[in-house]
């Protein structure tokens, strides 16, 4: 993971360690949105990874889809 992607991943890591354990799992997709975001940052870097993660989170709502949604290659 490049330095920019690492910096962007810090809030996601904070969410996963501190906030996520306090709330029920609400993600409609597999893998979870935070796992998807981390994988997208690792695979695609800061710019495209952030774009993919933002698109995914925007789809994760009660009227959105559900199921398996892996990070594209």
Curated annotation (Swiss-Prot):
Kindly indicate whether the keyword Cell inner membrane belongs to this entry. Answer: yes
> Cell inner membrane among the record's keywords?
yes
InterPro entries (UniProt xref): Membr_insert_effic_factor_YidD
Q: One matching Pfam family, short form?
A: YidD
State the superkingdom: Bacteria
The membrane topology of this protein is: Peripheral membrane protein
| Record PANTHER family | MEMBRANE PROTEIN INSERTION EFFICIENCY FACTOR-RELATED
Name of this chain's protein? Putative membrane protein insertion efficiency factor
Originating species: Jannaschia sp. (strain CCS1)
């Amino acid at each position: 993971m490049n330095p920019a992607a690492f910096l962007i991943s810090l809030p996601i890591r904070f969410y996963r360690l501190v906030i996520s354990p306090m709330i029920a799992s609400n993600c409609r997709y597999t893998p979870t949105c935070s796992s998807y975001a981390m994988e997208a940052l690792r695979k695609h870097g800061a710019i495209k990874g952030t774009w993919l993660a933002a698109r995914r989170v925007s789809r994760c709502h009660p009227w959105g889809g559900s199921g398996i949604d892996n990070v594209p290659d």
